[in-house]
Amino acid sequence: LSPCIWVHVSQPDRFRAAELLCIYLKEKLRTEFLITYGEEFTKKPISLYDFLIVGKISDQLSHPNFFKDYDPQVIICLDGPLPYLLTSRIKQNKYFSIFADVRSKNLSNRKLKILPNFRKTVFNNFDFVFTENEMTASQLFQSSVDEHKIKGMGLLQSSIAPLPFSENDVTFSNL
């Protein structure tokens, strides 16, 4: 299964969106997909399609040959939280990475005491970030995420198509 596109789903309510994303991309890219899931899942999800679901992310990342065996070209994460080992791999910039469906609850509220207006964020480690809605995109802009990385609306549970930004909001006119 090497090379492949790795899709990680943190929350059970985003699993169907992950499958829809894989179906859409498989038609366009003609590649294989590997799906992992987060600690929030109480049991292994069952795919309605022919995708390889390898298991919980913590089990896979603890396996020393995981990245050698699968060698993903792209890592797509749907929602959070993300395990440290995954974010450290993404931070190394070895893989093209996308964070889709960022929700407000994923954003850190911690402020550094030295720089009170700066919020440390993992989202700068990703190549692209798609947010759940305009409010979340605005929060990312305010929390020091590189402007060119925020690309628009993310996936909805029921739809694969990204939603456009509001034309009335001048904050997003430069995207």
Predicted regions and their residues:
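Active-site and donor-binding regions of nucleotide-sugar-utilizing enzymes
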Residues: 3-165
